[in-house]
Each structure stands twice: as C-alpha cells, then as structure tokens.
Amino acid sequence: MPDIDKAVAKFNLNEYYDQALNLIVSGRARNAFDLKQEKDKTRDLYGRNTFGQSCLLARRLVEAGTRVVEVVWPKVANSDNHSWVVHQGLEARMKNQSAPMLDQGLSGLLTDMDQRGLLDDTLIVWGGEFG
C-alpha cells in the first residue's frame, strides 16, 4: 500500500477529498470567482486593483465554504500589481502604491467579513517575507 493510501486510511482523508470535490463541482466555488456578481460599492471597498479584488475573492470563497484561502501578492508584469517587494524607490512606492493597496484591500476584507458575521469563524493571518 503506497504511503498516501496509508495516510488516507489512517486519517480518513476520503471525507476531506469528497468535501473538496463537492465544493468544486457543486458550483459554489466556481460562482465565487465571478466578481461581477458583487455590487460596485463592495468592489470599490476592496480597491479596484489586483490585490484588492483578490481579497474580495477570498471572502467569496470563504462564503462558498472553502476552508483555506491564501491571497498572495506577486509581481505581475504589465499590471497594476506593484508587489510588496521594493528594492528601488522604496519611499515613493510604499507611500503611493503598495501601502495604500494593502490598506484598502485588507481593511476592506476585514470590514466586509465583519459585517457579514464571517470573522467569528475565520482566522486571518497577514505576513510578509520577514514575518
């Protein structure tokens, strides 16, 4: 019996596999990806940029029943996504780009989840490459 099969048998992971598959095929998670279903006011709360809309998507996935959601902030070429890694022009980029995006996206997520009663059962962790 391969190691993964032993782990499944030992920890009864089949139930988790079934839940994950059901989440995907049921359409709940798939529908969560359609941000156009949100009101403009809600989308604006998070910020109309890659990070802000990713935070909104995270909230929608939690509402859809997703148990673990991760929002990453990579550098994306030719986009509004300025990334958190700044090696040149630190002061200007942090003040004018990265910090405002973070502030609006994360505070929008916390505000929206609180208004919907989702913070009672949700752990949100924010961290950077140095903690």
Please provide the spans of the model-predicted regions:
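Ligand-binding pockets and gating/stacking loops
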Residues: M1-G131
